[in-house]
């Protein structure tokens, strides 16, 4: 069974943030400039939280009480097929970073929940979950596959 994560879009910096459900800091905005590491604080979850879970592609900061660093992620399979062709996620996110009109925050959150969490939690395809770190996260990935370029998904 996969861990439950809270998925929130930070429109100010146009990044998707993950937080373990139940962490005291859930929903709190990430501090500092993009790429800054969260400040050290007493853990709201045990230090070994997640050690028993099958979480491939999530950086270790995903279990921090301060929440993970800014992340963008998607399902590799969805990127490789025409299922999301009408959304064309990389171009949508790139347009948002340029300040151009694109998918609404609500639509983007729904896309991630539908394409990622349904497959991950219900179908057990967590090995296909990819994490794309575009904002300077300095943490190592847990059981990470080979690095994958966001705009040319492998």
Swiss-Prot record:
Keywords, sorted A to Z: Activation of host NF-kappa-B by virus, Activator, Apoptosis, Host cytoplasm, Host G2/M cell cycle arrest by virus, Host mitochondrion, Host nucleus, Host-virus interaction, Modulation of host cell cycle by virus, Transcription, Transcription regulation
Q: Which GO terms describe its biological process?
A: DNA-templated transcription; symbiont-mediated activation of host NF-kappaB cascade; symbiont-mediated arrest of host cell cycle during G2/M transition; viral genome replication
**Any keyword Transcription regulation?**
yes
The PTM entry states: A fraction may be phosphorylated in insect cells and HepG2 cells, a human hepatoblastoma cell line. Phosphorylated in vitro by host protein kinase C or mitogen-activated protein kinase. N-acetylated in insect cells.
Give the subcellular location.
Host cytoplasm; Host nucleus; Host mitochondrion
Q: Which GO terms describe its cellular component?
A: host cell mitochondrion; host cell nucleus
Principal localization?
Answer: host cell
| InterPro entries (alphabetical) | Transactivation_prot_X (IPR000236)
Instruction: Return the annotated region ranges for Mitochondrial targeting sequence.
Output: 68-117
- Which superkingdom heads the taxonomic lineage of this protein's source? Viruses
Role noted for this protein: Multifunctional protein that plays a role in silencing host antiviral defenses and promoting viral transcription. Does not seem to be essential for HBV infection. May be directly involved in development of cirrhosis and liver cancer (hepatocellular carcinoma). Most of cytosolic activities involve modulation of cytosolic calcium. The effect on apoptosis is controversial depending on the cell types in which the studies have been conducted. May induce apoptosis by localizing in mitochondria and causing loss of mitochondrial membrane potential.
Q: Which family does it belong to?
A: Belongs to the orthohepadnavirus protein X family.
For this protein, the record's HAMAP family field holds: HBV_X
Protein name as annotated: Protein X
């Amino acid at each position: 069974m996969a861990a439950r994560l809270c998925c929130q879009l930070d429109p100010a910096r146009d990044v998707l943030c993950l937080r373990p459900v139940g962490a005291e800091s859930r929903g709190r905005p990430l501090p500092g400039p993009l790429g800054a590491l969260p400040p050290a604080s007493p853990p709201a979850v045990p230090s070994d939280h997640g050690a028993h879970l099958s979480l491939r592609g999530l950086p270790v900061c995903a279990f921090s009480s301060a929440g993970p660093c800014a992340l963008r992620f998607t399902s590799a399979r969805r990127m490789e097929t025409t299922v999301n062709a009408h959304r064309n996620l990389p171009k949508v996110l790139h347009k948002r970073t340029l300040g151009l009109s694109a998918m609404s925050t609500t639509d983007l959150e729904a896309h991630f929940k539908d394409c990622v969490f349904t497959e991950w939690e219900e179908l057990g395809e967590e090995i296909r979950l990819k994490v794309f770190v575009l904002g300077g996260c300095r943490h190592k990935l847990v059981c990470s596959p080979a690095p994958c370029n966001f705009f040319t998904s492998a």
